[in-house]
């Protein structure tokens, strides 16, 4: 047996290695890391167990429950120590529980083999050699402890023997317990009782302490008795036990503050508390026993042999107190020493030997295994062999580890403190405490489990969150990348677009700057086929025109040469024969003619001196002058010879001009050699190059530009002709004269298109006088003018050129016939006539070969197929022609072509080519949208290039800066109540309400259907009294006797008249004179009544005014101090060619469809010579058809601006100015700056006032007018209101519908009397017959004869059936005409209209009309996707139109279309939308309306059947009562029936339907039957 001094057997203090695997060697076949079951070193602490197998009390205290419970309880205590919460208030009780010895129910201790196999340390001492391995000096039979040294609740002290007196007295122990209890209560925060305070101070013991002392004394006495008995039995062992008792007692005193356990004695409130803060780690796990290692065999053998006799092992610490008492009793009863059992050391050694033998045998078996084993078995065998070979190494390693641990341990109890703990009695309170702690532990475990689960769920949620965040970040990155890519593409596209725009701007810049080469290069770079095609066609067309112009000039020159030769030959023959000179018509010149007063050029035969002009003799005095001046003779050159020389010298001039051009190119402007004349030429050339965009330099081939070819011969005109007197031409008029002279020199014709008022008449007279003086072209000149301007032309000729002989060809046929001899004699220069007489008297006027034909207001020739153009082209010979017009392009480009074709038919041949080239940007069918700005400019410039040589146009603002400004205002006018009602009915139904007098229903009201609705609407806007029956009915209503309304009711019925009533008095007060233009003569009559009511002096000029009276009217109005305030003119008759510059205010009462008519009318006042600012007031009714007319007029003016004005054919505008003007038109063409507001008095005054003083005066006049109206007791509003209207005009919609149906019924089925006869408005006579009838004076008789012949011829044709079959066999080519449907019965139409009106007018509870969006569909342009989805679009407007055109034959057809409309809405719109729901409601409304009408029909049919039955019964009764029958022949019956039918037409029977398909034969048959019927009567 090893002593405590032996270092190998001495227990060393140190940390417990815990319940880990045993460090002993592996003694089994398994080479794994688990503990060996037979290892001596497998336990680190003492293993308590039975001292002997045969001991009767060895199994006492065993119970059937596992020992892991205590280890599980120790585990959380370790966590408490680790977390540092030992100082917690509730920690003490848990510590006590953890340090308590095992419960009796913890079960029996396991065997050493099981302990080794499980791999954890047991807290009990080993049964294999208790005397050797347990280092307790107390013998097994001794009492557990001495009474003096016993501390209640101390498990170690209970197992200690009594080694002498205790160091503490009982009083000190009582005071110590009281102090511990007080400390515990203070730690819990509880108050200390007085008894406890006295006990702490040692003044008094706690109650129950005395009983405890007595028990302790009894226990001490018992222990002394036991010690005496043991001393007698075991005296040799006593010194050793005493030697060990002292260190153990000291160890107990050292470990006493570290124990946390308490015992509850029988006394109340007594507790023993020991603080465990000093060594928590050592108490938290079982400590090893510190048993010496069995490795050194020398130490083991003495230990085994030193045990004398049987030894009794002390009871396990977990045994309860009854077991101890029983053990004490047995030791007292049987003190005999028990026999010694088997030596466990030898058994252990034998077991070791056998295990080693088995291991060696197994190693040999594994080494001798064959090599042909499968791989898996071989692997297992190899692993097992290597494990067995490692056994000794593992054993050595474990010994070294244990040796090291033994050195670190000083006290045996430090390794396993629980081995010496005294077993304590378990009280009920401790059991409850244990149960409570167990519940807390379970709750804590559940909390931890839930917390762990919550953490798990949180980790899942966090993972999901991270997952989402990750993918969101990935998606964000992808989105950013996509955005970056899209941005890159957008930037690239933007840059490309900018580059494209830059190239387009550069191209436009070069196009505008006339850099043709650069422009073509850019076109080639872009490879725009469309622009290249336009350029190519432009070049081809212009080149073609250039060739045509050149050919035309050559042809004219050749003709002129032939004529000159012929004339020269005749002149020579006449000179030889002494015949008088011939006139322009080939006849000899009469002395009384104008030609006799012209100077004749003569030359001196010797000197060659030529006399011409005033110095030359006149033609009438030529012979006498030659006799008086010998040596002179008539110069051989006549006017024809002069023109011949011009044409012969044309080529020479061209060559010289080319040489001059070359010289100009060689000249250096900066050199000193350049003369002043050359410098001027250079400047002029530069100006021309800048101004004329078409004058190009000669190309390499020397060809000239289009304009240069056209105006090859140029002549400078610096002053007007001497024949032009009483005035001087302005500079721009001289330029116009020069341009016309250039046309004459180049054998071309043109259009003088100066704006109205710039003096086209004066320039024409100047051209005639210039040609007469300088070109010897005395005429005859044919000037064709409108009838309204004929007197003005005569006046201007008398004023400017009185020496020119003129004939005004007009008047009655007798007057015109009286002028024929003068025409034939040629004793005149100019013939003035009108368009009508040119056509009527062409057999007279066309015989004269006119030198010049001048057509004023040339836009009359705009229609190529009009009669005037055809007559002039076919009958009249005039090689030189000029058109005068202020509006060269009024509506369409073909009109412009018609003018050019009339002037130059050889150049402008095909209208289709011209229109195809230039009509694209102006077509109203959408072609204009397809052209971009550049293509539009190209096409317009191409048209300008074509027009420039033949058209000259200047505007007033350009040529006459002194001309006062012209300001135009569009004034919106309101309607009166009468106008509004009439307008609404006319617009919606096409009817005009009447009082019913035309149908003998006077006062009940009626309706009158009128054709040409737009014209009727314009009449209503102007004045409702333009309808005579309305005026008569209102006259009767207002009490006027003669059926004509006068006075204030005239202006109260019309909004425009009311506006005039406010404006005209102000203009008269400020001495402004007014031109008032109207479209309708009946309106002018109403206007005259109004002027008479207001006492305005006026003049009237319209189409009925005679030509003689017109000049007198103009003279009256224009004379200074004229008393006439207003000139009332019709737009068509008085808007052309009149000079009315005395007026400074123009009122356009109603606009014309052609805006140029209104412009012409405005320029009657805004002319050269006007001194005042001109105000143009255009009246327009709000929300009426007049606004549409104004919009159409604006579009036409837009076309004119693009073509004519942007060309700026004024010969001096630069290309930059023309480009800027055209660009401004294109940019602002869609702006609309009008408002629909009716202006108030202040706004009106601002419009018509020229100065501030006038504005103030007008405001005062308005104030006075309002005051006067307020003073009038019978005052009425300025415009008529609804309460003033008669009852027959205020009808509800149902009544108006009824009247409309009646009117339609009469219109379709007739009045029932007879069929309407056709009226032939065509001319019955041919022109020859008409002229002959005029001459004979029997015009009416001739017309009647022709009509009778036509009627007979038609009857003969009707009787011929063969012709009828031939006509039927003939078919028109192309698509057959659309058949007109036969009309429906009025009742069905009425029902359909009633149903549709019910559906359309249906409103919901909120008052919203559901059918508003269904009335008219949006256009394809606004909503293209609707028409892609819906195959058959339909709306209520189309349905009503089909009802009107009788497309529906039954209500079922109507229902199909309405259902289709609703179905379309439901297909296109989403389910649940408002339109979708409205369509469902409208379906139900339609069905209910149809059912209602069906019920009404059934009730009507039933009532009709009842009436018919009653009629049949009456007729039967009448037939029975009649006894006498009168027989008549069939003719009499037929005649009587016809007479009855005429007297009382039967509306119940079917009436003949008049349709467009009735042939003429059927109509005549009906007429004949009617005629025979009337004859029989």
Swiss-Prot record:
Membrane-traversing stretches: none
Compartments where located: Nucleus
Organism annotation: Mus musculus
Record-given protein name: SWI/SNF-related matrix-associated actin-dependent regulator of chromatin subfamily A member 2
Cited function: ATPase involved in transcriptional activation and repression of select genes by chromatin remodeling (alteration of DNA-nucleosome topology). Component of SWI/SNF chromatin remodeling complexes that carry out key enzymatic activities, changing chromatin structure by altering DNA-histone contacts within a nucleosome in an ATP-dependent manner. Binds DNA non-specifically. Belongs to the neural progenitors-specific chromatin remodeling complex (npBAF complex) and the neuron-specific chromatin remodeling complex (nBAF complex).
Residue ranges with Low complexity bias: 37-46, 210-258, 296-308
Biased composition (Basic and acidic residues): 656-666, 1357-1368, 1529-1540
Biased composition (Polar residues): 311-334
Organism domain of life: Eukaryota
Residue spans of biased composition, Acidic residues class: 641-655, 1497-1516, 1557-1568
